[in-house]
């Protein structure tokens, strides 16, 4: 709502309107300010009657016949005494260099602001309107229209004389006119007409709707949205008219253009002025209301509405009631709405006031959001439009937002917003921390404090740590873990923790936190001691990370008690730092832990701990019998006699059997299996492993009077011992379980062996035949003999240099060649000849495959 001086009316109606506006949550679309400076001076002595607006200046007409040129701040730049009576209208061309003025006493002046007077005439009736050609500055466009009882078009001829033509008359006074391009629109008592100055034709007549209203009290408002769109406001009716070209086939005797009403609707109040705003309309309305107390009609504040025109109705976008000076005495005809197209400025003119309405910019939007305490939206709007805002700073809005959240008690949200708003400003961070301290909310801001860039004073971090230490051990521990140790004075915090431990020495949270502080302070010994006391999982990580092996040599038992697996792995991985001997010595009083260590050592390397293998026999026997036999099998350093003694003492049969067999006493081992274990399958398996005929004989002898053992032997020995030997020894009449099945199995095994042998024989014969054929094919191939070959005996060329001379050559399958005379004569026992070289090398004898003679 426009700023206004305080009114002394104190009317109920005005205060009601104000309260309604205050409660509205809808953001206004326009902002208002009173045009002051020179305008205030003028209106203190005179009253405004009309005004026109140019991009560069304003022209204001008064009831006392004065015309003032004003700058956009309202300062007077020029004054014209045109008439002693009311100025009815002022018109400017687009260049702003020429002005037309008409007054109630019939005077009309058209003159250049910088070039002097061009037209001056006094008519015999009041002239209500004047409009100069938009391009009046051009010599070809020296035209203007005036309106009183008739509409006259003045045009300067080629001899610099003005001639006039009547465009319209006979329908009452001309009360409004607007010139745009080649079209002139005017309103009289009957309606609105449009004239085309190019075709010299009147192209439309839009009749007025409500003829009951006096046209002098409720004048028509006209404005051109563009060169072809005229907006008409009269009474409570609004029409949007579009000027269109008529198709050539439709012209005949009709004008080349016609008007189509594209939108028509009624408003709630009487229209005093219209202006376009993009695709919307700005409407100045004269409002009359009825008092609830007196039931009399009174003049209320005028309204400035932004509406969206539709085809048959409209949508209200915003509506503002304007507190202009003297609105209680004004009539509908006293208000005017002028606008500047280039800057979207709207001037509400009344006799005692001129108010400027502007589209709200981003700064205004932020002002409204802050006023409504919508700080989050204001901050977002400022960030998005930070290049366009002039009056606001993002930081100031953010600080106001933080203060608002704190006042509302949303401490966590306020603290979280500090990260974004305060950024890297260390001074502001420290200021906000102290503010949170004053309200006892240091805990709220602690998670969001900067930890790197920027870094605050150590005192800030220490203050927060002390706050947590007094009331929240877990929170204190969390901060110590999360905050880098260089943010605060470590020794100060260590001392504070130790003071608290004096009151609660067994508090695990404080102990663990103290260990972490010691670690950061490189006091690893104290940290390790606490970790071991707490049996904390990070103890191994601490040892590895800081190479604390020298500190744990006397703490091996503690480590093993805490986590034997991790401890053993660590000790074995670092044998160079803690020797095997040292570990075994430390664990001497804890043989169960000693076994765990030595067992893992043996798994890694069978030879490293060989000196302890004898000890390990008793350790395995005591703590880990399942792994004793594998150990005995894999170890090459344990004393067998000692092992046998221990196993026999503990009656470990399987281990004793293994040791007896390993020491060569297989018969005793077999006997133990039979007598102690009574396991024929294991006995048979043992006999198979040893593959000793005497063992089989002992096994048969032991089993011959035990039917279950005989069954086991019959089922398993068929592939190692002739079953007949066992069957012949079975006593007559002895009942043997499953004998038939056992005999059938023996026969099946026997048949299977025969089939396997026959199959093998067939394969061997087939392979032999195949190889024989291959050898035959190879031996049947020819052998190349040429001059390069030599006799293997005399080493001379195998072929004579004289081809006519007779020769005899022998070539063996081994490819060695001899002169026949160089070979020894066959013996009496064998007529076959063999290669001397291959025979000398103990190779298989090769017989001659070719004998060449000539």
From Swiss-Prot:
Residues passing through the membrane, by range: none
Complexes and interactors: Component of the homotypic fusion and vacuole protein sorting (HOPS) complex; the core of which composed of the class C Vps proteins VPS11, VPS16, VPS18 and VPS33A, is associated with VPS39 and VPS41. Interacts with RILP, MON1B. Interacts with ARL8B (GTP-bound form); involved in recruitment to lysosomes and probably hierarchial assembly of the HOPS complex at lysosomal membranes. In vitro can self-assemble into a lattice. Associates with adapter protein complex 3 (AP-3) and clathrin:AP-3 complexes. Interacts with STX17; this interaction is increased in the absence of TMEM39A.
SUPFAM superfamilies: RING/U-box (SSF57850), WD40 repeat-like (SSF50978)
Transmembrane helix listed as a keyword: no
Start-end of each CHCR repeat: 568-712
One cellular component (GO) term of this entry: Golgi-associated vesicle
Topology in membrane: Peripheral membrane protein
Compositionally biased tracts (Acidic residues): 14-26
Protein's recorded name: Vacuolar protein sorting-associated protein 41 homolog
Region (Interaction with ARL8B): 1-540
Function (record text): Plays a role in vesicle-mediated protein trafficking to lysosomal compartments including the endocytic membrane transport and autophagic pathways. Acts as a component of the HOPS endosomal tethering complex. This complex is proposed to be involved in the Rab5-to-Rab7 endosome conversion probably implicating MON1A/B, and via binding SNAREs and SNARE complexes to mediate tethering and docking events during SNARE-mediated membrane fusion.
